[in-house]
């Protein structure tokens, strides 16, 4: 079935590639995404960096057009098993192709979140997304890749401010 309201993107190469790679990794997409013009899609659990990889493959496989919040360092640095910096925006390992990584992350719909100074993020996001007609905003409510006992509440206040549903 076709979803007429859902934010879609025609992908001639990445769509089939996403479907193929999900099959290779023995992942299966089950259920349906509601046919809504605007929604916040909750990405849980997000307790490892590979979660983002599988989410990206699913987005490609379903030909979805999404935006997502990501820690600022993810846009310019490589993941590291060890914490190198105490500054939450400078985690990971610097590398010479940071500019290409940032370009690709932004093209994929990424919105960098500077965690050291994230005050006003929800208010700013409400203002930005109010003027957009059709979108899926993906949020991982854990706020990082660490296992947590309780979700951060930003997704709720964002959905409330935009008067749109959040979908688990």
Q: How should these model regions be labeled?
A:
Residues 1-28:
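N-terminal membrane-anchoring alpha-helices
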Residues 7, 23-168:
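Soluble catalytic domains of membrane acyltransferases
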